[in-house]
Design a protein with these regions (language model features):
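Short Gly/Pro-enriched turn/cap motifs at secondary-structure boundaries
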Residues: 85-86, 112, 127-130, 154-157, ...
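A short core secondary-structure module
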Residues: 145, 149-193
Length: 378
């Protein structure tokens, strides 16, 4: 996609968010909740699932457009909304488009594009985070149906989603290779939402426990082939990690912009704190770290568009960008002094929203292990 086209999409997205999100965001943050109608509004604005095919009502754009929208949300400080958006548009929709049947795509994608259906992805369990082989949720065949039982935790969009892609064991003897994915309609009997999980940050991203008690799924709820769920998840992880990196770099850029504006205005000892050498050096360090990760992100985005992004590069990018996000925003907050620790100043939200980025989508520790394996073998 040409830079001019991408800039147009960015501008359109930013205008829509300034109009539909910015005036209400502080109230949503305080309430620790997001109105369900926002997703319909974003759908009407053409911002949901923009790189899905036109035949499903989407723009048929390049994936870079989805990443650009993610970046604008993150740069503006809407970290929680960006995470919910990423799950819906950057993960769930591509799963269905890439591995679903035509029947599944026609049933779900148009409604995801419009915002009528909000998507969630349910992999993590109380005893299975990074270790997919420890999943206990299971699906058993019963005639032409599957019977789903188990529970999931830390599920983004879990309180509001109408569609949940659930990872479940279908062949216990095969471990992770016996995992399948199912498209679960949240209106089905036996599907229950637990409590909303309160978090350190990202308060506008609802996070929930989900329970499945004898949920009867039709045969066509299986996404992809039976026992190929792990393969599908591994195939889609580079895109997920690219999206997280886009959030990380853009949020750091937004935090830096806030900080520069602050130090140019704030005075101490009779002069602006921007005139102090420590301030100037810290800002120079932060800008450099962001620029390095921006270059790596853009390179990986180009590789993804060409079908060349490797799992190794995606892991390095996710690790580097999220560690950078946390460290640079910490430096920015320090320059605000005590004000930076108050909710009144947005830098505190950038700080709180950043911390989870080193955990979800693969922890920094797992990313380092993956990179090491690529060099040294198992």
């Amino acid at each position: 996609m040409q830079n001019e086209e991408l800039t147009l999409f960015r501008d359109m997205a930013r205008r829509a968010m300034e109009q539909e999100i910015a005036p209400h965001f502080e109230a949503w943050e305080a309430a620790h909740a997001l109105p369900r109608e926002l997703w319909n509004t974003l759908g009407a604005a053409g911002l949901l699932c923009p790189d899905m095919p036109e035949e499903y009502g989407a723009a048929g754009a390049d994936p870079q457009v989805t990443f650009a929208i993610l970046e604008e949300m993150s740069r503006m400080g809407f970290g929680g909304i960006a995470t919910g958006y990423s799950i819906h548009s950057n993960i769930v929709a591509p799963y269905i488009n890439n591995f679903g049947t035509e029947e599944q795509k026609n049933h779900w994608l148009p409604r995801m594009v419009s915002g009528e259906v909000l998507g969630a992805l349910a992999m993590t369990e109380p005893g299975a985070g990074s270790d997919v082989q420890s999943i206990r949720t299971n699906a058993v065949r019963d005639g032409d149906e599957w019977v789903l039982n188990g529970s999931k935790i830390f599920i983004t969009n879990g309180m509001l989603a109408e569609l949940v892609i659930v990872a479940a064991i279908t062949d216990p003897g095969k471990g992770a290779k016996g995992t399948s994915l199912f498209l679960v309609d949240a209106s089905l009997p036996g599907f229950e939402r637990g409590k909303k999980i309160e978090k350190l940050g990202q308060h506008t991203s609802d996070t929930a426990e989900l329970f499945f008690q004898d949920v009867r799924l039709p045969a066509n709820a299986l996404l992809g082939e039976e026992n190929k769920g792990f393969v599908i998840m591994m195939t889609e992880l580079p895109r997920e990690r690219l999206g997280i990196a886009a959030q990380a770099v853009a949020a750091a850029e937004g935090a830096l912009e806030l900080t520069v504006n602050y130090v140019l205005e704030r005075k101490a000892f009779g002069q602006t704190i921007a005139s102090f050498q420590n301030t100037r050096f810290k800002l120079a360090e932060v800008k450099t770290e962001i620029a390095l990760n921006r270059a790596f992100l853009d390179k990986c985005a180009d590789q993804y568009a060409a079908g060349e992004l490797t799992a190794d590069d995606a892991a390095m990018l996710k690790y580097s960008s999220t560690e950078m996000q946390c460290s640079t925003i910490d430096e920015c907050l320090q320059l605000f002094g005590g004000y930076g620790y108050t909710i009144e100043y947005p830098i505190s939200r950038y700080y709180a929203d950043a911390r989870i980025q080193r955990i979800y989508g693969g922890t920094s520790e797992i990313m380092r292990e993956l990179v090491a394996r690529s060099m040294l073998g198992r």
